Amino acid sequence: MSQPITRENFDEWMIPVYAPAPFIPVRGEGSRLWDQQGKEYIDFAGGIAVNALGHAHPELREALNEQASKFWHTGNGYTNESVLRLAKKLIDATFADRVFFCNSGAEANEAALKLARKFAHDRYGSHKSGIVAFKNAFHGRTLFTVSAGGQPAYSQDFAPLPPDIRHAAYNDINSASALIDDSTCAVIVEPIQGEGGVVPASNAFLQGLRELCDRHNALLIFDEVQTGVGRTGELYAYMHYGVTPDLLTTAKALGGGFPVGALLATEECASVMTVGTHGTTYGGNPLASAVAGKVLELINTPEMLNGVKQRHDWFVERLNIINHRYGLFNEVRGLGLLIGCVLNADYAGQAKQISQEAAKAGVMVLIAGGNVVRFAPALNVSEEEVTTGLDRFAVACEHFVSRGSS
């Protein structure tokens, strides 16, 4: 008989880079999860914008099981049918001509930054190596991507960091313009800063970045790891803005919970990457590709994408009612089903405490820094699940406010 597993085992056995909740989920269906004790939770965290179709979706399970019954892995000395079908779906649905597959958003961003450096090196020379990123950004945890992310708390302990990376103020085209010049090889930006507080870019800002990149022969990289695959109500957020990048990174929702990432590129950009210039053992794995292909098939429909916009309205309307009652938030912002509630000055820095109260009440939410409660639910979350989950969130807000005033 196997040893019973408890939450305390995490503290005993795991390298402590996470501080997980005190309960352990063991089963999920749709937008509901149950823990070891049988307690039910409505899941508005979505595995941090990953579980785009909820838990244990029957068609994703079928796609995974079908491929699992054939073969699991060969390595990149061989290709496979699943990954080629997935590549064609992404190319047909976006600006891209070529795709590189990997396992995560960080790997996709690493590949994008490496491609940008090589593109500039081959076309213009080694002097053109500068990367412009943005304060409060998040692009992953590799040394290169954590350096591009504009949050020193994630990078300062790992110096010396890769050089020639500078950070402008987000949504400030003048700040970006002061840093972008002929030595810049790339600008990397999130259309919505997710970890940085659910802050949407303005159209003028992204259009201005496109123009600056064109003027200085720099590549424009959109990090759509969190915003991609229907999260905003378009397949990718760049489609909202009418601004097309040279490179786009995608992961999270692309696999619906199965690890997969991708770099999308134009033909011109992709041409500098030749055999041996980059790679990954598991990228394009047939299991991941089979699941991701089904995810795209289910999400890239007018019904699903329009449904995301409708669900956005459900959330915002109910969250504003809750806020009118308890007065916690200055603003409810975001696009589609990436929504942030910004705490007012009286409750600054207490987003984590609210998320903990929410879990006690039976609803899972995220934070984006100390001041923003973040929602990233499944794109197919039902109206009943939204209502039930936000009723529980209202209870959590009531408990939080009453605890603070007691």
UniProtKB/Swiss-Prot annotation:
This is Succinylornithine transaminase. Its EC number is 2.6.1.81. It holds the Pfam family Aminotran_3. GO terms for molecular function: identical protein binding; pyridoxal phosphate binding; succinylornithine transaminase activity. Belongs to the class-III pyridoxal-phosphate-dependent aminotransferase family. AstC subfamily. One of its GO terms (biological process) is arginine catabolic process to succinate. It is an enzyme of class 2 (transferase). It comes from the Bacteria. Keywords: Aminotransferase, Arginine metabolism, Pyridoxal phosphate, Transferase. The modification N6-(pyridoxal phosphate)lysine is found at K252. Catalyzes the transamination of N(2)-succinylornithine and alpha-ketoglutarate into N(2)-succinylglutamate semialdehyde and glutamate. Can also act as an acetylornithine aminotransferase. Its cofactor is pyridoxal 5'-phosphate. The lineage of its organism: Bacteria, Pseudomonadati, Pseudomonadota, Gammaproteobacteria, Enterobacterales. It catalyses: N(2)-succinyl-L-ornithine + 2-oxoglutarate = N-succinyl-L-glutamate 5-semialdehyde + L-glutamate. Pathway: Amino-acid degradation; L-arginine degradation via AST pathway; L-glutamate and succinate from L-arginine: step 3/5. PANTHER family: AMINOTRANSFERASE CLASS III (PTHR11986), SUCCINYLORNITHINE TRANSAMINASE (PTHR11986:SF113).
